[in-house]
Amino acid sequence: MMRCQIVSSSRAGRAPRAVFLWLASLVALGWLFVGGAAAQGGGELRFCLRSEPKTFDPLKVEDDASESIRYLTGGVLVRMNRQTQALEPGLAQSWEVSKDGRGIAFKLRSGIAFSDGTPFSAEDVAYTVQQLMDPALHSPTGDSFRSGPGNVETKIISPTQISITFPAAVAGLDRLFDQVAIVSAHSPKKEMAVLGPFVVADYKAGASVLLKRNPNYWKSDAQGRKLPYLDSIELDIQANRDVEMLRFKRGEIDLINSLDSEYFDKLAATSPQQVRDAGPSLDSEQMWFNEVAKAPIPAYKRAWFRSQNFRRAISEAINRDDLSRVVYHGHAQPAVGPVSPANKFWFNGKLKAEPYSPDAALKTLQADGFRLDSGVLKDRDGNAVVFSIITNAGNKSREQMAVMIQEDLQKIGVQVNVVTLDFPSLIARMTQTFDYEAILLGLTNVDLDPNGEMNLWLSSSDNHQWNPEQKTPETPWEAEIDKLMRAQASSADAAKRKEAFDRVQEIVYEQAPFIFLINKNALSAVSPAVHGAHPVILHPQTFWNAEQLTAGK
């Protein structure tokens, strides 16, 4: 999520693009292990992905593992510097946004080739945009550009010049291209031909992804040395945090991109120089109920989950202060809503974290006919309130939170069954079979700007997790959010955008489709073997400058 002014000139400082990714571990936030031998360069950076990447197609990315690979391999027209939060030239050496906010013209660098040697030109940009905006592709990245109905027009002026015109104004248009990895229009390797610093060299399902230095990468450092410095990056697929920490301590991996607070404190006690706390992050942990009409759950339970009073009551009955204190050892704060207070411009300061009150929760439930019967909460038809919460196995923080939520809700007569699943099984239930009642996961905010959240809040989106891909909004409040999100996305007036997105946050607070729990600090661990790492709060926190990292013994 990102804040700041809306910029229309090529090098204007710009807020990062806020795209919410459901982390594989969705909660886990990807990892990267970086190594470094600063002077000599070379070496291998070793790190872990906390789940299997769902795709290598950069236009279809919606999970954290795939996003990490896209970031490391994809070449973009403009890149948001994760440290300064300013836009910097990428494959485009300059660009200009039209005054009406509908168009953008790029001047591309010449003499660049994809990793397989295929020349890069404006044709590839046009092809990428056409694919990105194709409704049949269902690109989560493309959702950020959908501010109005109609087709996108691309005009190739020369091999190094292209203009793109959208049917309606798109706020922060230049910034959004930070997430658009350009794909080749002609390479037989399709999306596996890349323009970023690394290329996928090997993939062993369930085990690892090996990235190697892209020999055709166009960047050099200030001394004229070709980037990246690293020869390779080995990404091990490892969901178990205990194993990950053990491997870090043994020196088998170089970096932990998102460190649990328990591990942070333990490592800080013995090796304080290896831990980094960048402060409050943009990411959140939350739970939600399944409201999908075709989900294989009893109708009476779906009625509970679709009730605003039920969702609000569950939220009121959860002790967020305890979650922050016990689970995160003080390295977290109770969440207010979809925007972290660390996102200073876009955060709605009028909202306050839900106060813990079992009494208020019971009162709210009574409005829907729920009642306590010998310590058991029942609905008006006599059905005992029982549901399961699923979360990803191996994530100790989530597992502990689920148990604490179970204990909190027991105080109002609700029986919660906690179920842990491997991440692929969880994702399948969440996105394919809809065979679940409630889910506890995390949300990663890639940018500060609400435009990056279009794929989360639009009712038609497949990332609208509680009830995705609605043909038309099924509730008045979702219709209002659709309208507000499109309005802010098509406005060049920062004050009007802020007003619209403040209202979105208020609706989400009132309706509680997501029950936001905590915002955790950006904690990471970096091996002394890694040189050049400067962790930040924006994704990818530790390896945002991977092309400049070095790894050594």
Language model: regions and residue ranges:
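Cleaved targeting-peptide boundary
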Residues: 39-45
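Surface-exposed binding/hinge segments that line
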Residues: 22, 40, 107, 141-187, ...
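N-terminal secretory signal peptides that target proteins for export/translocation
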Residues: 1-17
